[in-house]
Amino acid sequence: MKIVSRRKILKDNLILGVKRYITINLLFLFLLILVRIYEYFYLKSAITLPANSIKLELSGIGLDILMLFNLAVWFALPCLVLFLISKHLFNLIYGFLVILFIFAEIALIQYLGTTSLLLGTDLFGYSFDEVIKIVSASGGFSFASLLLVIVFIALIVSILILSRKIKIGNLVAYLFIVVSFTSLMFQRYTKPDAGEFKSELAYNLTTNKAYHLFSSTYKFYYPEDASETSLYSYFYTGLSSVGRSFEYISSEFPFLHKDNTPDVLGKFFNIGTEKPNLVFIIVESLGRAYSGEGAYLKSFTPFLDSLELKSLYWENVLSTAGRTFEVLPSIFGSMPYGKSGFAEMGADMPDAISLISLLKERGYVSRFFYGGDANFDNMKVFLNKQHLDYLIEGKDFGLEYKKMPPIKTGGFTWGYGEKDIFKKSFEVLSNAGIQPRLDIYLTLAMHDPYCIPDQDYYNRKVEERLSANNFDEAQKIEYRKFLPNYASILYFNDALRTFFEDYQKRDDYKNTIFFITGDHRMSTPPIATQIDRFHVPLIIFSPMLKSTAKFSSVVSHLDFTPSVVAFMKNNFGMSFPTVVPWLGHGLDSMRTFRNTNSIPFIRTKNEIIDFIDRDYLIVNSQLFKVSENLRIDQITDEKKLTEIQRKFEKFKTDNLKACLNNSLIPDSLKFNTRR
């Protein structure tokens, strides 16, 4: 009798546990639908949604339902064991997990509303201190956001408590179990297929944000097992993994090759006897979407547009990353990315050569001007390893300079805006010697939260710009959702105009070459295509120019240093290493559209999923045809997809080998050896 009684008690408790587990999951589903409704109305007020956004949200609800039934199967056993141990503990822990998931979903919806992006493994590419700075600069959680979270948590707790009175029948329980196990056959559909969507925002809107973050986190810490050695053996062919063929030196140094970069710049310049000063202005978030002729959001950089007409102008330039962390290694060293970005390797960065170190050996003095903390993204570590002479950052600015305003009183600010950065640089350069210079500027204002000096003035300038473009009221409403973004662009444009007005007063102006480019596009307004985030301009301006030109050929940040070195070597009698590890082939001076390169991208730290190969782009397993103005159209061609994926995998293998084994350059090319 005792045995029968215990078995019956166990059976009854198990049935009770199953029903309680199902009840909480059904309430979880109700909350997910509630959050989807909130998401639609919140994002509709915050950003410009796709025309079919309601349909996308309904598709998202379908994916949420499938996700929930999948999770219900995987969590069932541990939850039932916990229920049998302690009903109270089960309610507490599983209730907490539901609250955590919903809280994460709300927070990530707000992140999407601010950035138009999903948060994934790029989170793990930043230190805790850097994450705090990013969140603080964006204003953190506002009171309204905090109140919303409190209301949701209170609602969830109330529902969980009241749910104890809900008794579900056997039919509901059986149906839930059958549907849950059936859902496992469709597990791969819990995340949408990116290839089915016309825009990245449409995909992001449909995706469950919390599930994306948690599943990405799991894959980050438990990646699919792949032997680096076997990959290398399989893909290594001795051919270039990055476009036009290089003459490689040795498989021990995967990227080392003879430098045959042609000088495409020299013919446009009046060459004097003095070595020119080189000034690089790297503009935070300067995308082609809102700068230059043909900008699809209309141009908000009138002065820069006028400068393009007096310059060598490349309209189809690709950055190598969707954030700032890779811009210095790419522009000044044409370097690979390692696992999470070249500079992210910190003290373990492989030995390399760069424009900074090469010019230092040839008599140049280098300076880096930045209005923030150069420790961010390991910029200072990278620049010091490249033997930069002087680094001027935010802490070096005096009391006469004023930081950009924080989003809320007493909050964090990234540092000083462009006007102050340029002003500080003239103060520093007033004491510069007669040696030729390499001056590097990295700006800050066009960065979330886009709080700038004279905000009201530039907000009015945006309104004037909207009227000048003859936008109707409906268009103006959409543009006003990103009013601070556009205001920050106009602020930069004015700062650049003042910079050149002041520079013209300097004696060395006539012997200076200016390079202006963006590090990537803003994430808001929403990115139109998969390649849009990387699309930036390049303007090379100088009083030394004897002719101007506009080029439509596709080039990248990786091409800058090879071309500058070829220019200096060919026109100023300077000798440089005959072998180099650069990924870029140099700038292409074709005036019509073409792409002769293969370019890998590191979208965010920990995300190397984009690769362009001549007229084709792959993003994960999607294949796109690339055409004029960097338009992309998704196509199906399994043979071509496989061919390009092999090239991409070879690059990724070479990339890890060179970076993890310090085999980018031999000892003979290292800075201390050559001195």
Where are these regions (language model features)?
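Alpha-helix capping and helix-coil boundary motifs
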Residues: S5, I9, A46-S53, I61, ...
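Generic low-complexity, intrinsically disordered sequence content enriched
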Residues: D122, R164-I166, F235, G243, ...
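Extracytoplasmic/periplasmic/luminal assembly and interaction segments
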Residues: S227-F255
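Generic detector of well-ordered alpha-helical segments enriched in charged/polar residues
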Residues: I15, K19, K55, D129-I132, ...
